[in-house]
Amino acid sequence: RTHVNSPAIVIWSLGNEAGPGDNFVAAYQAIKDYDGSRPVQYERNNNIVDMGSNQYPSVAWVQHVATGKANVKYPYHISEYADSMGNAAGNLIDYWTAMESTNYFCGAAIWDWVDQAIDTYTPDGYKYFGYGGDHGDWPNDGMFCMNGIMLPDLSPKPQYFEVKKVYQNAGITLTENG
């Protein structure tokens, strides 16, 4: 019960991309027995949880769900979007314009916040962010650990500034009257 009183925990999750099955029904019930005050989400099976969720929907789909007339469970949460591999996350404003137009959405979670790598050094002392096969092993199938909006040392990447602007607390719109 370490984190049950944390104000930072607003939703419990059954996991990420782990498939369906009876174990998730049992896990949902165990979480509700443990803490019935917070909703539970799981993007692989919205039938067994308290709120709707999915990953990487299109902007058009989000706009439709924002009407409150979609065949989904509300409130709705995008559990994974804006994968920031390379130069990505440029259409966040389109997602958030739709989500903020309604009370049917309760947010979305960026994948990933920070690149997953560690300080690594060449034999001559040059420091770089190392991951996966950089350490002599090959347990991975690609560069799926350097897709955050922050570098491993927490310095911002270009995507960070897009997110900061879109997530700002105040919205300003120019009207015809200036």
Tell where the protein language model's regions lie, with residue ranges.
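Substrate-binding/catalytic cleft of secreted carbohydrate-active enzymes
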Residues: 1-149
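Surface beta-strand/loop "capping" patches
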Residues: 154-178
